[in-house]
Amino acid sequence: MKKLLYIDLFCGAGGTSTGVNTARLHGEQCAEVIACVNHDANAIASHAANHPDALHFTEDIRTLELSPLVHHLQKCRTKNPDALVVLWASLECTNFSRAKGGQPRDADSRTLAEHLFRYIEAIDPDYIQIENVEEFMSWGELDENGKPVSKDRGKSYIKWVNNVKKYGYNFTHRILNAADFGAYTSRK
């Protein structure tokens, strides 16, 4: 019986899902990714080949009809009644990252985190985990040229965090350096 059931948004080809599914407690699998969403058909095809037991949606998270996901979650909860549900989102980071340099940001892409509230309301997860670059915390308004407005630095992020808390969640964050976990990069 699984202790954690994961829904993986922005699942890509499945790196996070592989990590979740290989988690062990006392030698037994303790977590399972049960559903995945990604807009890229090639990524979903790769993910499905590696994780055939998960339900896959090739769709933008903003437009996905959530009732099939909710129904699937209900079935999985029936099989694992004591399991906690985790909503995992590896939000698109390009339009927050320093790696974008001085290029204009895509305002629509920067609002993807706001669309998570639909999922929170529909599936009522026990936990929410977000993975992104540290610049996500500087999320604010953009000017007419698509450049971040320095006086608004972090305001949209703080508003978003406060909205997460309104659903009754505690909120903590950590900045991790990939190099500290064996990766050949110092990406945070």
Residue ranges with predicted function:
Residues V33-I34:
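Short beta-strand element of Class I
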Residues L9-G14, L91:
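Class I SAM-dependent methyltransferase "Motif I" SAM/SAH-binding loop
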Residues D40:
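Conserved SAM/SAH-binding beta-strand->alpha-helix loop
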Residues A45-P81:
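S-adenosyl-L-methionine
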Residues S67, H72-P81, C93-K188:
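Class I S-adenosyl-L-methionine
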Residues A13-Q29:
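Conserved SAM-binding loop of SAM-dependent methyltransferases across substrates and taxa
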Residues V86-W88, Q129:
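N-terminal Rossmann-like NAD(P) cofactor-binding module of classical short-chain dehydrogenase/reductase
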Residues K2-Y6:
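Extreme N-terminal starter segment of soluble prokaryotic enzymes
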